[in-house]
């Protein structure tokens, strides 16, 4: 019988809740001994690390007298607790917290593997990226972060397979944001036409829950830039940070200084119609050339160039033909020649992102 594996989970938002639902349905699931949210931590009591936290009933488990309750713990405290478990342990970080991500090396050096959709650790300063993987080697731990790009789509695993088998990746190009995919597929469809104004489409996306609470967090292009940073690094480029290459922001310059408060968001949405003519001109310029405009990211590995912004595409191209909020990522390589290897599908949503996390967890369990 294989030794038990212990699990700590941080974050119970949309992705975290979906992950716990999937975890509860796994046969032979690892033992859930720590569940942390912003202000409270639930723990299996030491030294037995038993009973464990029921993933299916995690919301009511806080009432269980045999479990230990605590306030928020520091990353060091969580790492010490998990490292003392009577078997290998895994941390699943379902947050987007940069402070927690910067502490991944602390966990990895203690032999705690890390599984996460949190982009911050892998797309911030290059020194942290290098430290994460050095710490994993030192602690004989594993790091899986498939869901940092493309939610549950096999983007990172596909790129790693290409690189690890000796293929030469020359270019990566695609639509990496479900939000921006929806915005442009609606605003400038490849088939038919749309009379919707840009501000109306942004409002619609916000109401449907496609955007971040502050749509500027999507429109500034930084989310796409972080994903491109991760892929470029896997492809062998030492990208220093996501702001070390050109990013075309879709936030009008006049609105960049509005605060990120609820009032600032309301002001942004109220004033966005003032700039509809600018986006209409971009759309019409593409139409006159028989094309459509899309927001894409690209990595030119040979030229060592990364770029994020608007680009025109033929209406019959795969990128132009995307529907809804789908992502598409094309890998151009020596082996695949002029026909790229394409990964396409839903690139956003709690369930599909959690699926990527759960699949990574299973891969780590297989390898421990």
Swiss-Prot record:
Q: What does the entry's cofactor note say about binding and number?
A: A sodium ion is seen in the structure; a metal ion may subtly affect the relative position of the nucleotide-binding region to influence enzyme activity, and could increase the stability of the enzyme.
Q: Where does NADPH bind?
A: 15, 59, 95-96, 119, 349
Where, by residue number, does NAD(+) bind? Answer: 12, 14-15, 95, 349
The UniProt record lists the EC number as 1.1.1.3
Amino-acid positions noted as binding L-homoserine in the UniProt annotation, renumbered to this chain? 212, 223
Look up keyword NAD and say if it applies: yes
Q: Name one GO biological process term.
A: aspartate family amino acid biosynthetic process
Do you know what upregulates this one?
A: Down-regulated when grown with elevated levels of potassium chloride.
Q: Which GO terms describe its molecular function?
A: homoserine dehydrogenase activity; metal ion binding; NAD+ binding; NADP binding
Enzyme class, top EC level, equals oxidoreductase
Protein name from the UniProt record: Homoserine dehydrogenase
């Amino acid at each position: 019988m294989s030794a038990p594996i212990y699990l700590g989970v941080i974050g119970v938002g949309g992705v975290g809740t979906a992950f716990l639902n999937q975890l509860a349905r796994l046969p032979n699931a690892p033992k859930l001994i720590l569940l942390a949210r912003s202000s409270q931590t639930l723990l299996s009591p030491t030294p037995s690390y038993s009973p464990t936290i029921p993933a299916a009933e995690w919301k009511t488990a806080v009432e269980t007298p045999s479990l230990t309750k605590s306030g928020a713990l520091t990353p060091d405290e969580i790492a010490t607790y998990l490292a003392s478990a009577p078997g290998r342990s895994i941390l699943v970080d379902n947050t987007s917290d940069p402070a927690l991500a910067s502490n991944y090396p602390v966990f990895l050096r203690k032999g705690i593997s890390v599984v996460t959709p949190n982009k911050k650790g892998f797309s911030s300063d290059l020194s942290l990226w290098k430290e994460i993987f050095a710490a994993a080697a030192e602690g004989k731990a594993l790091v899986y972060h498939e869901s940092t790009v493309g939610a549950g789509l096999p983007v990172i695993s596909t790129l790693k397979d290409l690189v690890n088998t000796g293929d030469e990746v020359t270019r990566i190009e695609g639509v990496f944001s479900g939000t921006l995919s929806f915005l442009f597929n609606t605003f400038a469809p490849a088939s038919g036409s749309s009379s919707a104004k840009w501000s109306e489409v942004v409002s619609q996306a916000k109401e449907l829950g496609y955007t971040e609470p502050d749509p500027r967090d999507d429109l500034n292009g930084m989310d796409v830039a972080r994903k491109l940073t991760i892929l470029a690094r896997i492809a062998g480029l030492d990208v220093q940070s996501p702001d070390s290459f050109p990013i075309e922001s879709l936030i009008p310059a006049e609105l960049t200084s509005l605060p990120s408060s609820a009032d600032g968001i309301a002001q942004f949405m109220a004033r966005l119609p003032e700039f509809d003519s600018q986006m209409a001109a971009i759309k019409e310029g593409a139409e006159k050339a028989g094309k459509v405009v899309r927001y894409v990211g690209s990595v030119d590995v040979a030229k060592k160039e990364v770029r994020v912004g608007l680009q025109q595409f033929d209406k019959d191209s795969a990128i132009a033909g995307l529907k809804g909020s789908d992502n598409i990522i094309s890998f151009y390589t020596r082996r695949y020649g002029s026909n790229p290897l394409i990964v396409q599908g839903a690139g956003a949503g709690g369930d599909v992102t959690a699926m990527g996390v759960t699949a990574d967890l299973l891969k780590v369990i297989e390898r421990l």
